[in-house]
Amino acid sequence: MIKPDALPQFLRNKVEENDAFGLVEGLCQLLRSSPTEKISPTLHLFKFILKNDKELGCSVSKLLCGWLCGLRLYPLFISSGILTRGGFGQEMKTRIYERFNPSFKDINDLRDIFYLLFSDKNDARWIDAVPLKTWRGVFGVLTRYTEQKDRERLKNHIESEGLFAIEMLSIWIAAEDMDPELMRMEPSLLNADSPFVALHHEVVDWVAARRQSIVFDDSHLQVMFDQCKALIIGLQKRGAVVGSSLNTAYLLERLSQTLERLETLMAIFVSNRYLPRRILLLTGCFARAAAERHSISRLWKQSSGLIARSVTQNAGDHGEHYITRDKKEYWAMFYSAAGGGVLIALMALFKTYLGSIIDDKVWKGLAEGLNYGFGFMVIFMLHFTVATKQPAMTAARFAEAVEKNPQGKTLNMKLAQLLVDVFRSQSVAVLGNVVVAMGLAALIAFVYQHQTGEPLMNSEKIAYQLHRIDPLDGSLWFAAIAGVWLFCSGIISGYFDNRSNYLNMRMRLAQHPLLKKLMSEKSRVKFANYMHENYGSLIGNFCFGMLLGLTGLVGYLTHLPLDIRHVAFSSANLGYSAVSGQFAYPFFLQCIAFVLLIGLVNLMVSFSLTLWVALRSLNTEIDSWWAIWHEVCQIVRKRPLSLFFPVQLDK
């Protein structure tokens, strides 16, 4: 490792050895090992040494110029920072294999040189620590020491490689026009005048004009760029409608990156005088991309964000149905939740029955999961509502509002109003679930005791149910786990909705050979339409039920504190316990407070997790939660009843 005071001798040694790569590598190592505050001074020292030793400066610039003229540049231009063509699966396997058996690096290929120079994941730290002005100063000194003929030779080499890279990128973009996935999503790509193909024709003419130093009217070229960008955005949105796989999302992201790189290179080579600022910015992008070239975590983070967008988009579409904005929607939500409360009370009773007839923990957990899963599916099919299912949907809708609106006070007011609408909707849904589930449970317990003369639950079962809702006995932690499963069920629903669109489930089922034998055409089409529209919701509800039922079993088998508490089932169990145990009124109110606390944790955890994922998938963020909270307080101060009831809704 070289020291700053040994830098002059190091430069002389590398010049004598004719080792340009070693010179650049040593300089990068010196900058990498320097504290952040000393990185710029170290680069200033390098510039100072060259300025004050003309002979050394001329030797270094001649060495670097000759080295660059002998390198292949275009592989770096067309690949660095752009997703590979192999797809997510192939790229993941390549990066994992690279960890165990690194590939050979060719120091005559600038792409490999960048990887060797910037192989540390923290290299972005020192790259970003150097102002652009400092880099321009260093290259300015090197340029002054370079002879005119060498400058011309380097310029011609860079231009030749750059124009070739531009041609290759335009060919790639035009070739994607025939990708089966893109044609499935947008059949108009089959037209001969596709924007991708038209852009390629314009780029070919532009490159020919540049090689002949002819002025080129690029007005139509810019129109083609705009149309290609609009088409890619349209395809990304179309994916949420017709469904998209991870590979499709990966393809669209690569197409977008390729188009952006093409535009950047054309902006650099548009004239004979290259703007140093643009070249340096592009070089910085190459350096950061090289540092992340074999990063598995970076690939996973990038790729998972691609598919998350379409998943949360499907969740957001459902979320709009769970937000009430007038009295009609408010009472419809209440009646829907009340219907859900009826089935929840029966599901809780059946769970108690299962516990009394099944002793084996594994079979009991499986039976409880099936009880929950099929119960939630029936609730959904009857158009009833489970209150805590909505946050996973409404959070995605909230994130969409952040993306669609500009930043500022208007946005904060809209988000605050949306939060108030969501809170009111959740409140009435919880109220419908809790009141009806608890009331029906109490009625069933009363009728049972009246008919048999014995309470539905004995003292041991009552004590067990009270223990389950006590905040001091971990009920809030278990409620948080249920909130995580609520979040997961929303993601699962979104994924399978996307999958249904991607597979064109409607047409598959309508033309299924077996269904043709079993059902009439009318029934088959109706069944196909229903499954296509509700595929994700049915699977999401079933998976949510299984997760609830099996969590306690996993906790039992692993001896970990794992279980679930759900507000609706806790309220039903409280109804059975209250009548069986003849609770005193104050104690009963305390138990209701505990149940509502469980519901609050269910809602907060599921909403927060889904909002975080939705914001990330949309690549957006909320500037100030405090400002939104201030707007919420303003709304509550002006229209306090609108927080809970469908009144004072005039904006």
Language-model region placement:
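Alpha-helical transmembrane segments and their immediate juxtamembrane interface regions
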Residues: 336-339, 343, 347-350, 363-383, ...
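Long, compositionally biased intrinsically disordered regions
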Residues: 186, 211, 231-267, 278-297, ...
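Hydrophobic alpha-helical transmembrane segments
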Residues: 272-289, 307-320, 369-380, 422-432, ...
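Soluble N-terminal domains of membrane-associated systems
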Residues: 1-311
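Juxtamembrane/interface segments at transmembrane-helix termini
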Residues: 1-44, 49-55, 59-62, 357, ...
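Generic detector of multi-pass transmembrane helix bundles and their immediately adjacent loops
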Residues: 374, 389-391, 400-569
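Core alpha-helical transmembrane segments of integral membrane proteins
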Residues: 312-410, 430-450
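Catalytic cores of large soluble enzymes that bind and process phosphate-bearing ligands
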Residues: 220, 243, 247, 254, ...
